[in-house]
Amino acid sequence: MEAGQKMGPAQEQRSFARRHPWLLGTAGVFFVLLVAITVAGIMTARRAEPYLHARIVQGLASHFHARVELDTFHVSLGNGLRGEWGVWAQGHGLRIWPPAEVAGVEVPNPPPTNGPPVEPLISLASFGFHVPLRYKPDQPIYIGQIHLEGLHIHLPPKSHFLHIAPAPTGNVAQPGSSGLPVSVQLGNVDCKDAVLILGTSKPGKLPLEIDIARFKLSGISPNNAMHFEAELTNPRPVGTIHTKGIFGPWQVSDPGESPIAGDYRFDDADLGDFNGIAGTLSSTGNYVGTLRDLNVDGQTDTPDFSLTHFGNQMDLKTQFHAIVDGTNGDTRLDPVNAVLGHTHITARGQVVRAFAKEDGDSLHSVGHDIDLKIEVNQGRIEDFLHLASHDATPLLTGDINLKSSFRIPPGKEPVHERMSMKGLFFLDHTEFSSTKVQDRIEELSFRGQGKPHDAKSPDHESIESTMQSDFEVAQGVINLPNLDFTVRGADIALKGTYKLDGGLLGFTGVAKMQATISKMVGGWKGLLLKPADRFFKKDGAGTEVPIHIAGTYKNPEFGVDVKGMPHSHPQRPDEKQSAEPQAQVAAPATQH
C-alpha cells in the first residue's frame, strides 16, 4: 500500500483481528458460555417445574386447609420489571375448594360423589410473577408483584362451615407450614376481572354477585390484615365504585367472616337506568364489618333528581346508615336523613332484592322492593308537589308535617305508578298558587266570618288555611278519605281524590260557616234571606251546605249540591250539637 493511502473499514477490521486474535477468542468463549448458561437455566427451570408445581399446591393446601388443583405451571428465564434477570413463572387453572373442617387439617376429604357438586372457593384463570436470581440464604425470596386474572371467589353460606365433616387424620402438614423449602415475601398483588359471589341459604334468594374490574393488595403477610384498592362495577345504576381500605386477616374456618373496612367513592351514576326517575348521583362514605355483614355510613348528592314523567328537577341530598346483608344484598336503612329542596325527610326501612320465576325459568332477579317508614317535620309541601307536577308552579305552598309508609315494589312501570304511600299529614300556613283558587278561598273566609264587603276589597290581607287528613297514594292517585280544610270563618270536611297526572280533582263534602246565610250575603239581599237562616243552621254552624269540587287544580269547579239541601231542617233553639268536631289526624310539630 502506498504511503499516505488510507485503509477502508473492512481492511481496518481485518488488520485489528490479525493484531488482536485473543480478543476474538475471548468473545467467542463468552458467547458460548452465555448460550450454555441460558440453555442450562432453561433446562433447570423446566426440570424444576414439577417440583415447584407440587410445592405451590402443597403450600396453598396448607394455608387454606383445602383441596387445591393447578392445571399448568411454567417457568422461564427473563428480565423483570427493573431489568433484573430472574425466573418468570406462569400458572393457569388454579382451584381451591372450601376448607374440609373448621381447623387443624389442611388436606380435606375429597368432594362427595353423591349430592350436588361443590363449587371451588377460589378459581383463578391465570397468574404470573417474576423472581430475581439474587438470593441470600438468610432472607426470604422477595416477589415484588403477582399478576392475577379471572379470579372468582365463591363464599358458601355460613351454614356450610357449621356442618363440615372432619377430614381423616394422618401424615399431613401442620397449619401455617408453607410447604415450600424457603420463605417467600410478597410485595403487591394486582388482579383484573374478579368476581366475588356470596352464597345464601335463605329460601327464595340468590347469591349476591359483585364484579370487581381491578383490585390491588399490598402489605401482604401471613395471618395479618392487608391494604387494598379496588374498582367495583355497579350494575344499576351503571358506574364504577372506587374503594380502598384494609382487609383481613383471612378467616380460614369461615372466609365470609373475614373483616374488612374502607372508604368508597361513586361518581356520576345515571339514575336513568331505573324506569321513571332521572338524575346524576354521586356518593361517598365508609364501611366496616365482614364480607357477610357490613355497616355503611355515607352520603349522596343528586342535584338534578326528577320523576321523568313530570320532568321537574330537584336537589336531593341524603345521609344514611345502612346494614348490608352480604349473603343476599338486602339492606336495612336506619336512618336515612334526606333533604329534598328545603324539606328534611327521615326514613327507616329496608331495600330487599326481589326474585321471580317466569314461564318455568329458574329464579332470577327482578329488581328491589323498597319499604320505608318516613316522617317529615316542618317541611314544605311545594317541594313534594313540584317533584310530582308537570308545571314549574306547584298547586299550593305551606308547612307540612307527615308520617307515612312508603313502598316501591319491583316492576317495569314508571316509579310514580308503582309508588304507594299510606299515612297522615297536617298542612299549615297554606296558600294556593292559583290566583283564582286563592281568591275563592279568601272570599269564602270573609263571607264565613260575616264580612262580605271585605271579600270584595282588593287590599285585604292574604288568608292562610290549614288542612289535615289520612291519605293513600297508589297508581298515581292521592286518596283523601277525611280531609279537614279550615280557614277563618269556615270549616270544610271533604273526601275524594287528586290525580297527580293532570291534577284532576274529585271531592264532595260539607262546608260549615260561622256566619248565617244572611250575614254571608250581606246588604239588602241578606235582609231578604234572614228568614232562611234557620234552614241552614246545623250542628252549631251558622250555615252548613253540601258542596263538591271538580275540574283541575288550575281550573277548579266549586258547587253546592242542591240535592242534599232538602234534607236540612230548621234547627230549633234548644237543639244540641249532635256532631263532635273531627279529631286532629296529624297534629303539627310546632304551632304558629
Per-range role (PLM):
Residues 471-479, 484-493, 501:
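Extended serine/threonine-enriched, polar tracts that run as long, contiguous segments within proteins
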Residues 167-179:
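Intrinsic-disorder/low-complexity linker and hinge segments
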